[in-house]
Amino acid sequence: MRATTQPAPPASGTISGNAMAKRSDTTTTILFALLANGLIAVAKGVAAWLSGSTSMLAEAAHSLADCGNQGLLLLGMKRSMRPADADYPLGHGRAIYFWSFIVALMLFSMGGVFSIYEGLHKLGSGTPLANPWIAVGVLVFSVAAESASLWKAMVQVNTLRGTQSLWRWLRETRRSELLVVVGEDIAATVGLSFALLAVVATMVTGNPVYDALGSLAIGMLLIGVALFVGIEVTSLLVGQSAEPATHAAMMRFLQERDEVAEVYNLITLQNGADVVVAVKARMTERVSALALVDAINRCEHALRMEFPDVRWLFFEPDVTA
């Protein structure tokens, strides 16, 4: 079996240029979300203190958790870029999956569980809102800021998903850090809508129960998003293949190559932003060992040109499956 890496020899363990470009785009998206959530967290915290709104307090906790989460994602991306070595011969690309899972836990606990706790507490106390218009103003500002953050993330997502529906992309993407950012932004935008409706309903009716119900709804929303993200990231942690469309495209590409008579097996493994590929195939060239090696080299080069995410490539010629 032959094993090759791109573009440097295996000992270098350098990150591919295509992966670096992807991470640069995602880093910009995360920093944009971090800035938006930092401003929103401060505004929500002040509004919660002045108005006594538990929905607003739940949203402040949510935004604060989001800031911490985005910091963890940046840490995970930095760690995933460490070069390969003797202990980690395929590099540290999957480190981003671990930190994405930690983010899901943070969203579940600091966001969801805290919001439900505050909602239940408010149901028992029945404390009325003070200065509700402050809460409304901050919520309107927060919706605008979160919408801008979501728009920034969706610009990158739309370039990646092509003709896929958003739901299918969320289920099949291997970009865990982008999945987390989009999930958080969607949850934040919907959660803010819940909080705004709860505060307005409390203002109109004078009944603080609506504010408590808003906090409970936000908590359940965050827990739902956290569970979804956690399940998807767990698959990547265990060791998931490249996206189905990519795997199928690689198989078609190999089957159409003149050098390949039959593909016995194709294994792909997503390793952060890079892909590990193992191929077992029967080659058409059988004249000599040198001719066979040359045919494999041509096939490998063509595969890398067509799929630049491929960093590690193992190619085994054989005559039986």
Residue ranges and their predicted role:
Residues 27, 53-56, 208, 212:
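Residues that define the loop-to-transmembrane-helix transition and helix capping
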Residues 2-7, 13-43:
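Topogenic membrane-insertion module of multi-pass membrane proteins
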Residues 23-32, 61-71, 98-110, 144:
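Alpha-helical transmembrane segments of integral membrane proteins, especially early/N-terminal helices
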Residues 7, 92-321:
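Alpha-helical transmembrane segments and adjacent TM-loop junctions that form the membrane-embedded core
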Residues 49-78, 82, 116, 179-193:
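Acidic (Asp/Glu-rich) catalytic motifs at the cytosolic membrane interface
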Residues 2, 67-81, 156-166:
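Short, charged cytosolic
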Residues 38-46, 51, 63, 67-73, ...:
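Hydrophobic alpha-helical membrane-embedded segments
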Residues 76-95, 125:
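Aspartate-rich (DDxxD/NDxxD/DxxxD) Mg2+/diphosphate-binding motifs
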